[in-house]
Amino acid sequence: MSRMAEQQLYINGGYTSATSGRTFETINPATGEVLATVQAAGREDVDRAVESAQRGQKIWAAMTAMERSRILRRAVDLLRQRNDELARLETLDTGKPLSETAAVDIVTGADVLEYYAGLIPALEGSQIPLRDSSFVYTRREPLGVVAGIGAWNYPIQIALWKSAPALAAGNAMIFKPSEVTPLTALKLAEIYSEAGLPDGVFNVLPGIGAETGQYLTEHPGIAKISFTGGVASGKKVMANSAASSLKEVTMELGGKSPLIIADDADLDLAADIAMMANFYSSGQVCTNGTRVFVPAKQKAEFEHKILERVGRIRPGDLFADDTNFGPLVSFPHRDNVLRYIESGKREGARLLCGGEALKGDGFDNGAWVAPTVFTDCSDEMTIVREEIFGPVMSILSYTDEAEVIRRANATEYGLAAGVVTPNLNRAHRLIHQLEAGICWINSWGESPAEMPVGGYKHSGIGRENGVMTLQSYTQVKSIQVEMGKFQSIF
């Protein structure tokens, strides 16, 4: 593949060179080839983007709800028309198979934008009667300029999850994609402009997270930060946001989620769910159910079914129709995942399969790790306690409900959880005791536009998707109207 042209920043409706003079490279993780050199935004570029966003936001917010809705719907149409083009670029940048990016990444992002475009006319205030001569009414007004900071695992989907409610509510957004996967966010900016979004309402600033991201969190002209990433980075973002100007924050952070297989579960269904909860996107999904709790008496049979299904994983050419497993997103991340795997071996977990980098057959130059399953795991092991963000499943056995609930909740995380059982009374009883913000019964992983998603504990603050997220991008103004005679005590 030929190297792409140097990528610039997208500010005020068009591409512009970074003033910092700094660049970084984005890599195809399947082959190790450089895809493009990307310009990195500096502090002056953030200032330019904020000024542009402030101008554009005034124009955008002054439009009627239906005008804004039509523009966002045009962007939805453009996304769907260009699905294949965007999916191919996402595959090159992330290492996900085309079978995945073409069916999920752009499609689900467009769904969220369509959902919020439809909600714009329904964004309304309320009227509260006080007495015959007086009433209060409320208005939901935009925050102004907000910033989104994305993660590298779902680049365009995350950009849409953050920008859709923000723009629908009348805000402007400055989006910083991960430096690991920056390419499709720039294409999204082009699409928004083509759809008719006023200049400056959606700006994209590629850059190094510790620098560009910090400039955004510290900028007094930004009213809110929506961040997706790790817990440690999220705490820094939150601290900077509070110290600078008491910004509002939404945080979608890490997870170490439990998947509980009940003793009455269909083990074939349970194994299918566990595979999707661990190996989809090569395990690089924040909600993955990496702690798989299985009744002790059924563990051996469950292990057998998992190994059967691991045999159906097909790594290879990312553009081949039958490939369903790709490399990890980068070489540093691959090395980190391999270190976790070695810790599992060292701490006494029994390795059922994988446990190493994939070699040969075109894998040598990429960031490939074999699908890995550990069993006989215990709660204190590093692979059970810490988020790995790779294709590593840990199987743990349990004896009764009280035990498995206690152990499932014994984590600083609280992003997701799941239960597999045909007994819905039991399913609800278990789910209601689990400390997690996103839960599934007899399923895993679907996050439709209508469903609020977010975590408990260290897994985040606030929600993405759903009606409540649209409201979180507004501020409420209360107005009392007095129609009678005003009484003064002076």
Curated annotation (Swiss-Prot):
K(+) 2 binds at residues 246, 457, 460. Binds 2 potassium ions per subunit. It comes from the Bacteria. NAD(+) binds at residues 150-152, 176-179, 230-233, 254, 286, 387. InterPro entries: Ald_DH/histidinol_DH, Ald_DH_C, Ald_DH_CS_CYS, Ald_DH_CS_GLU, Ald_DH_N, Aldehyde_DH_dom, BADH. Its cofactor is K(+). Pathway: Amine and polyamine biosynthesis; betaine biosynthesis via choline pathway; betaine from betaine aldehyde: step 1/1. The modification Cysteine sulfenic acid (-SOH) is found at residue 286. Keywords: Metal-binding, NAD, NADP, Oxidation, Oxidoreductase, Potassium. The record marks 248 as: Seems to be a necessary countercharge to the potassium cations. It catalyses: betaine aldehyde + NAD(+) + H2O = glycine betaine + NADH + 2 H(+). One of its GO terms (biological process) is glycine betaine biosynthetic process from choline. Its EC number is 1.2.1.8. The active site is at 162 (charge relay system), 252 (proton acceptor), 286 (nucleophile), 464 (charge relay system). K(+) 1 binds at residues 26-27, 93, 180. One of its GO terms (molecular function) is betaine-aldehyde dehydrogenase (NAD+) activity. Signal peptide: none annotated. Belongs to the aldehyde dehydrogenase family. Involved in the biosynthesis of the osmoprotectant glycine betaine. Catalyzes the irreversible oxidation of betaine aldehyde to the corresponding acid. Dimer of dimers. This is Betaine aldehyde dehydrogenase. The lineage of its organism: Bacteria, Pseudomonadati, Pseudomonadota, Gammaproteobacteria, Enterobacterales.
